[in-house]
Design a protein with these regions (language model features):
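N-terminal maturation segment of proteins
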Residues: 1-190
Length: 190
């Protein structure tokens, strides 16, 4: 990388990390078993702090005192959250409103490329809660898996994570600033 260009140095580090992740994934596909920490380090350059489960007991005790009802905590938390379930016939409108609000708050701080947009789709039979399929040209397909409960908090969480300032915004800006602005073609591979 060029000594005077910090962005070029970051590009070099990014590409190096991508190669490390690809090598790690190839090792896994070839049957090598990695510890959780080694997998996280190889794929994400992250070192997770693995703590004994008992470290979480004080936090669980605080939650236990806050969540109403009787019985196991997990059942009570689920019953509490179910009070915020979005009826099926309202999910589209609520998701669109949540994403619109996430976008409004994002563009107040981060200008988005002109013409950026997304298509919202509800799907089943997936292993994930929500997904952003970046299509290029500042467009995304945002999918929401309705096999899982669609609750109010999830609508906002997915709106932020998959949309704004999440994957859609991130990829549109990468395409605009790095692929288009600098000619860095690796940011056109999705």
């Amino acid at each position: 990388p060029q000594a005077g260009d910090p962005l070029a140095r970051r590009r070099h580090a990014f590409l190096d990390a991508q190669l490390t992740a690809a090598r790690t994934r190839l090792r896994m596909l070839q049957g090598e078993r990695l510890s959780f920490a080694d997998e996280a380090r190889g794929l994400y350059a992250a070192v997770p702090e693995i703590r004994p489960l008992s470290d979480y007991d004080p936090i669980l005790a605080r939650i236990e005192a806050l969540v109403p009802g009787q019985g196991p905590l997990a059942v009570r938390v689920d019953a509490f959250q179910e009070r915020f379930a979005i009826p099926t016939d309202r999910q589209d409108a609520v998701m669109r409103a949540a994403i619109a609000e996430c976008r409004r708050r994002t563009v107040a701080h981060i200008p988005m490329p002109e013409g950026e947009s997304f298509v919202l789709e509800f799907v089943t039979g997936r292993s994930w809660s929500g997904y952003n399929w970046y299509q290029g040209n500042y467009r995304s397909l945002i999918q929401v898996n309705t096999d899982l409960p669609v609750r109010l908090g999830r609508a906002v969480g997915l709106g932020c994570h998959e949309g704004y300032p999440g994957h859609h915004a991130y990829n549109a800006l990468l395409e605009q600033k790095l692929a288009g602005g600098r000619g860095w073609v690796e940011f056109q591979v999705y």
